[in-house]
Amino acid sequence: MHIAALHQPSQVQLNQDGNLKHFLTIEGLSKENLTKILDTAQSFLDDNNNLINRPLLEGRTVMNLFFENSTRTRTTFEAAAKRLSANVLNIDIARSSTSKGETLRDTLWNLEAMAADIFVVRHSSSGAAHFIAKDVCPKVAIINAGDGRHAHPTQAMLDMLTIRREMKKPFEDLSVAIIGDIKHSRVARSDVAALQTLGCKDIRVIAPNTLLPVGFSEYGDHVRLFNNMDEGITGCDVIIALRIQNERIDSPALSSQSEFYRMYGLNKERLSLAKPDCIVMHPGPMNRGVEIDSSIADGEQSVILKQVTNGIAVRMAVLALSMQGQLQEQGLIDAIAL
C-alpha cells in the first residue's frame, strides 16, 4: 500500500453535499472543511477548557482497530466516543483472527457485520485507511488514526485547535517551526498540510538532512527548510517538537541521540530565540533529553497537556461530523456547531 495510490482523497472523504464522510487525510479538504472541524471541537470545550459531554452518538458503535501500538490516540478516541454516548469496542488485534492468517478484508467485513458505525484505524501501511474506506467498507465511517509515514489527520487538527486557542490570532500572522524527525513523521506531513490550508505563510521545517524527506519542499512557497536549529526558530510563534521515529528508520540516520540533542534539542537557550509568547507543542511520546529538555516540556510555555484535552474535543468533532447526515435526519444537528 503506497501513498502514490491515493488519488483525489476529497472524493472519498466527502459526501455529495460536501460534508465529512470519512476522515483520512488533510489533503483534499478545504479551509472551510478544517474550520468546521475546529469550530465543532470548540463547541465541546467550555471557557475553562473543560470538556462538555453530548449524547449525539447514543446507540452508535465505534470500533477502535489499532494495528500499531498507541496510548494517547487510542485512549482519547475511546474517551471521545464515550463522551458522545457511543458504544466503544477496542479490538485486540494481537489476539484477533488476523494472527491466524485471516485477511484484513475478511476481518473488517466480519466487524462491519456486527453493526459497526465507525472504524477508527491505525495501521503501519501508508494508505490503509484510504483502502478500507474506498474498497473494503465504504458504508462505515473510517477515521484514520495514523497510517505508516503518510498521515495523522486528527493529530494535525488537535494541533491546529491548540494553536488557535492559545495564540488567538489568524494563522496568516503566525510563524510555526516543526523540529525533529520530519522524514518518518506522519504528524509533520499532516501539520504542514493543515497549516497551509488554514493560511499560515511561514512554516519552518528544521532537521538534519538525514531526517528530511525528499520533495518535502513541494508543499509550497510558504514552507522553508532549515538545517540550522537556531536560525530556524528565531522569532517564531509556535514550536512543534517531534521525536525520532526509531521504529521506522531502516538505516542509521544519526550519529547518536546525544549529538542530536546538541544540535537540535529544544532547551532554554534556544527557546529564548523565539518570540516571548511562543508556545511549545509535542504530539508525544516525548524523549526527554533528545528532542526536548524537561525544563521546556514542563515549563510555562509548554501546552503539551492542553493538546491532550484538545485531542478529545477534536476526536469528538470528527466522530460526530462523520455521522452528520444521520444526526440531521434525527433532528440533533442543532446540538453542536455543525
Curated annotation (Swiss-Prot):
Pfam family, one: OTCace_N
Annotated catalysed reactions: carbamoyl phosphate + L-aspartate = N-carbamoyl-L-aspartate + phosphate + H(+)
Binding site for carbamoyl phosphate: 72-73, 122, 152, 155, 284-285
Subunit structure: Heterododecamer (2C3:3R2) of six catalytic PyrB chains organized as two trimers (C3), and six regulatory PyrI chains organized as three dimers (R2).
Record-given protein name: Aspartate carbamoyltransferase catalytic subunit
EC category name: transferase
InterPro entries: Asp/Orn_carbamoyltranf_P-bd, Asp/Orn_carbamoylTrfase, Asp/Orn_carbamoylTrfase_sf, Asp_carbamoyltransf, Asp_carbamoyltransf_Asp/Orn-bd
Residue sites binding L-aspartate per the record: 100, 186, 243
Gene Ontology, cellular component aspect: cytosol
Domain of life: Bacteria
Organism: Acinetobacter baumannii (strain SDF)
UniProt keyword list: Pyrimidine biosynthesis, Transferase
EC number: 2.1.3.2
Gene Ontology molecular function: any one: aspartate carbamoyltransferase activity
Pathway in which this enzyme or protein is active: Pyrimidine metabolism; UMP biosynthesis via de novo pathway; (S)-dihydroorotate from bicarbonate: step 2/3
Function (record text): Catalyzes the condensation of carbamoyl phosphate and aspartate to form carbamoyl aspartate and inorganic phosphate, the committed step in the de novo pyrimidine nucleotide biosynthesis pathway.
Membership in a protein family: Belongs to the aspartate/ornithine carbamoyltransferase superfamily. ATCase family.
HAMAP family membership: Asp_carb_tr
Gene Ontology biological-process annotations: 'de novo' pyrimidine nucleobase biosynthetic process; 'de novo' UMP biosynthetic process; amino acid metabolic process
